[in-house]
Amino acid sequence: MHHRIRRRPQEAPPRTRALAVRPARLTAAGATLLTLVVVLLLAWVAVAEAAVWVIPAASRAYPSTKAGARQTIDLDAAGNEYQGVQVCVRGGDRKVRLSWTTDSHPLIVDNAELSRVFYVKVTTPTTKLGSRPGWYPDPLVPRDFGATQSVPGSVNPGPTTPFYVLVHVPLGTVPGEYTATLRVENDVAGGGEVVDVPFKLRVWNFGWQQISTRSAFAMSQDNLKRSLPRNFNFAGQNKAEVLRNFYTMMKQHGISPTTVHYLPKVSDSSGATAEGDWANKVAPFLDETDGAVGVQDTQLPFLRWFPWSRSQRPSSSAILNYLTQMTREYKERGWHKKAYIYILDETTKRSEERQAERYARLAHKASARSGYRIKFLLTDDPRPRSLGGVKTANTFLYDDVDIWTLRYYYFFGRIPAVRERQRAGKEIWWYTYTNASVRKNPAFVIDKPHIDSRVWGWMMEKWDVDGILNWGFNRWGKPTTGDGWRDPYRNPLSLIKGNLRSNGCTSLVYPGYYPRYGLDRPTAAPVSSLRLEMLRDGLEEREYLRIAKTLPGGGTRATTALKKIITSVPKVRQANVFNFPTYTSSNATFDAARRSLAEFIEAQQPQ
């Protein structure tokens, strides 16, 4: 199949001759003629610069990006995998349309989504990154195939406008090659180019039920509520629908919210809960039955501010009573295997670690009454000996912590202790956020290449890390406090802490209700970002690595692929060191490593 470019005939601008008179003495007729010539020339230039081209999902097209040459789409995907690609158009103010031709395969047409890639304006670059102010592509605002759209429009710069085409391959799809044609009309009313882009999708003969990497992304219900119209009643069925769509979107991206946002009624004094009503409200999100969201990982509602406020000092018996009832409910509902307790954050002082010890032992005592051990997550690092300063030995926690969640920049100085804890059956997660080492570490900031989001899955497989925690997902509040309202479409600066400035590290999605961009449904799911799509791609690519390792010779194949991605590895030692691995900046290298794994896995499957 070859792409076809059709242009309506354009009338050439008329020739002009040099005028013998000086400009100051132009006649009215001459001035009119000159104006007409200029207008026609500008129109001709606009048409000449108009273009349609294709770039990979992980690339970035800026407002000033020049047209490329590629006009074909060639994707491949496993069962239950999502794959994206960007189609860019360039030109002045006009209407464009993307649609499927009638000969396109239903698998592609029925499972494809279209988004326009909008730009956000970074005015304060992320600290220590070395990036520049300017317009960055990020939010993926949903659009409909077949609908005409005005671009660039008054709310975003141009002349280049990217669109994001995302295809999902349902698990169980027959392997093979599927084709379609994506028709791009670059100026619907003005006679611009019409490009038929050949679209090829290869479906591999393997797949997965869900992403196996564990996760916890802090979703703010307060910020979500502030993003909705003032007259919207965020309660009852309205609230349930908003949360269902939000959590479903997260599930589709292979990640989980920390807490499901319904809390039980609790007696402050005794810790007794009002059972039943709360559990019935969260069941549609936590259950694995048909029609339920099936959130993969969940934080049991035992928080610094719930069921007791920070100023209260509940007795151990009250805490034990509450946790006994809650862990029993989780066991009876079948949620206990996905649940964890996470009540303290970054316990750097000995007194804080002793408090964690107390909470963990109460939680384990409570869950033991229901015949299991609920996992206790702590954002701390295991230390068999003192490392100086506040980093004293904490082996007294070894039997209490089930999920050690290490800050990424500490991890590479804790590997010996981490491996010892893994041999003892403990989970290891990474805790990521932006700091002064942002240039060296993977980060979710907007003004850094999307490789950073994609590499997480590969890095986690390389270092045998079970999960990832990020302390913000929709932090649409003030960058200093998180309170109030910040429009992330217009102000991407999501965090100010001391001298640190960060764009988007705690804001991976955008409000799904945003009439300015044509999003007028309050219950809609949040808007994804190029960064979040790349995170999912990396987590899906980790599934390739894990599947390959289960096959004869697959361990070697996985190791070879990882070496192409991770270009240097720091020395292993237990010390306060901050040496980090390096990784390729080439998306083509990622793509080649992924495809090599896919071809190996497919060849090993029974015919």
Task: For each feature predicted by the language model, list its residue ranges.
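Bacterial N-terminal signal peptides
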Residues: 30-44, 49
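Surface-exposed binding patches on compact interaction domains or structured appendages
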Residues: 51-70, 92-165, 174
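Short, solvent-exposed loop/turn segments enriched in Ser/Thr/Gly
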Residues: 69, 80-86, 161-162, 173-181
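Short solvent-exposed strand-capping/beta-turn motif centered on an Asx-Ser/Thr pair
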Residues: 78-80, 90-94, 103, 172, ...
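Aromatic-lined carbohydrate-binding surfaces of glycoside hydrolases
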Residues: 90, 136, 141, 148, ...
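Catalytic domains of carbohydrate-active enzymes that cleave complex glycans
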Residues: 305-311, 319-356, 360-393, 481-607
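Glycoside hydrolase catalytic-domain groove-lining segments
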Residues: 394-405, 409-437
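Active-site clefts of carbohydrate-active enzymes
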Residues: 423-454, 473-475
